[in-house]
Amino acid sequence: EDQSFDTRLRGVLERIATLPVPTFAAISGACMGLGMQLALACDIRVATDDAYFGIPAGKLGLVVNHWTLQRLALNLGFGAARLMVLTAETFTSDDAWRLGFTQVQGDLDAALELARRSTDLAPLSLLGSKVGLNLVERALDEPEFNAAFERAWNSADLTEGRLAFAERRSPVFKG
């Protein structure tokens, strides 16, 4: 994996986020890393009581893309996003609900019911609203962030983080 992985991933996440219809995430159990990124791409998130959320990128020596960090901050709040990313904190289902990251506490049936309800609404109204909401979240990538992102993805720390994860040991990062 390298930065081309992130480029492809970001393309997938942006495609999901900009689909012309509402998207719903039904979350049960772990919603970590890539799962969290997929949930961030969805419009509405429904979670069971046993769901938990996190982006443990620092444990692997990598940086998630700016798109993810931006959506995380806008959906969780800047303080909670910083706590999650900068300490690898895992949030419970109740935390996610309290912070507004999840909109409904329920199961797959609850998510399917919301999706069904949305099909009764005017498609162009939904599309216009979704485009407007997505514009609130749009910002240009900053060169400073891009440089930090490239340094992390090209670092020995990333290799060490992945190796330590595979070997089930604590990583030794050198920065």
Cite the ranges covered by each PLM segment:
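Short alpha-helical scaffolding segments that buttress acidic/His motifs in well-ordered protein cores
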Residues: 84-85, 129-132, 149, 165
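Glycine-rich phosphate-binding loop at the start of an alpha helix
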Residues: 6, 10, 33, 66, ...
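An acidic, glycine-rich surface segment that forms the CoA-thioester-binding/catalytic face
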Residues: 1-28, 68-70, 151
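Terminal low-complexity tails and localization/encapsulation signals of metabolic enzymes
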Residues: 163-175
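C-terminal long alpha-helix characteristic of the crotonase
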Residues: 46-51, 93, 99-143, 156, ...
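A general structural signal for well-ordered alpha-helical segments in protein cores
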Residues: 9, 69, 78-81, 111, ...
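CoA-thioester-processing core
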Residues: 12, 16-18, 32-85, 110-114
